Amino acid sequence: LVFLALFIVAFTIRFPFFFRDYIDKDESTFILMGQAWADGYLPYLTLWDLKPPLTFGYFGLMITVFGKSLWWIRMGGVFIVSATSFMVYAFLRNNNNSEKKAFILALLSLYFSSLFGSVQGVMSEHISMFFYMGGLVVWGYAYKELTHKKWVLWGLGGFFFGLSAMSKLNLAYPILLCAAYISLKFLLAKGIKNTLILSFSSGLGVLIGIGVTAVPYLRENAFQEWWKAVFLAPRAYAVFHWNTAFLLLPIVGVLTFLLVKSLQKPQNKKSDKTNYPLVLLSTIGMLGSFIMAGKVNGHYLLQCYPLIFILCAWLGFERYLSSKKAIGLFVIFCVLLPFESYKEYGAIYKNKQVHGTYYNGEGIEIPAYLKKKQRPLDNILFLEYHIGYWILDKRPPTMAVTHPSNLFRNHLFPYYNKRKTAQEELSYILDSLKPAVIVIDHKNSIFKGRGVLETQFTKKMSQRYTKDTLIGKAQLYQILPFSK
């Protein structure tokens, strides 16, 4: 019943966003990568993006099972968010928290994982935390017993953790911290032999979780491509910035202080703080990974919300749970909070009245226009609204523009691209491939403020292309006849 309640709430909040062309560029990219996998082409071999393969595997699975449907892809997101929130509930119940408290915190985790910014789609953070919370719940249960005899559980938890890292690689940091802590705890309490059994079973689980994603590449004799994309390219992408460090280090310091305090207090099976160190270490590892990456995007925080609301259980607000006034205010808060969803319900209703369909956005309208006008569909460059490729059953012209922003990431080119610079890539696309149609944002072109690249793009467009039409924020350009 708890899962069903969470599922209904998640569905209600997220449903109006099922019909948007794209919610975040990353999700559109994942759909393209997943479609290629569903068509029989492994990630990184025909299209490329900087994420581990399991993220694309989700989209490929949904497309394979349900066909090309934004509805089903995002319905799967409802299940993932609901299940992750339910695992927050299960973790808290396993640590002797009341049903009411556990449900409230799970509900808040669900809300924050579905609202505020471009998180109503299915992000890699959603997928990774689904597996990570699975591992944390299993390890948390086994840790309460503090015995190596539950080696199957240690291995299963490790397997979930391995899968989580293959959805979002930064989770390797919290996994390593938790594993090191548990091993040290076992070493001090149970001796070397039992610690080795624990470490072997949990470590083997993690390695199996990682290794299963390499199997398809070994079969295709493409292990090197997997290795470069999963492990080498992310190292090149991460750039340490002091601004990010100064922002997050104070929070890490507070969490470390709480961790030290928690370790000073003896725990038992009936305590609600038995797994407190695991959650704190997970949060510290998560924030540490952001510091190492040098940036914090809004959707990165999706990985923190389940952990933060678990930590909130130890704030001690039990007395408010018996107050009808407090519960009433909380209900009102929950009703008012999803204002983005209410706004989107209005938008899809209006779109239905005007266009006869709930599906909306430039990524839907541009393909419809191109088909209606019988424009060439085999050679299109979407520099915005690139979900349009998927709607048209096409693929991006080169691997570097699978995600349009990857065009500017020269430091990643050595891991997948024959061309070494963005200028070379742009010249290849415009001079050799000569897209028949190019789509950009008419006000905020991705080349804006890019110096040499902006000049190069603007010059080529003025020489070879003419404006076709404006659809929403999308400006379509058509190649001039003499330029073909």
Where are these regions (language model features)?
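Transmembrane-helix motifs of polytopic, lipid-linked glycan transferases
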Residues: 8, 75-96, 134, 138
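Transmembrane-helix signature of polytopic, membrane-embedded enzymes
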Residues: 88-112, 129-130, 147-148
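Membrane-interface transmembrane helices that cradle and orient dolichyl/undecaprenyl
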Residues: 94-96, 133-156, 257-271, 316
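Short acidic/glycine- and proline-prone juxtamembrane loop motifs at membrane-interface regions
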Residues: 117-128, 243, 297
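Membrane-interface alpha helices of multi-pass inner-membrane proteins
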Residues: 151-169, 175-180, 208, 283-292
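Hydrophobic/aromatic-rich transmembrane helices and adjacent perimembrane loops
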Residues: 173, 293-328
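Perimembrane helix-loop-helix junctions
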Residues: 174-207, 265-266, 310, 317-318
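Short periplasmic/luminal acceptor-recognition loop of GT-C membrane glycosyltransferases, typified by
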Residues: 180, 356-410, 416, 427-449, ...
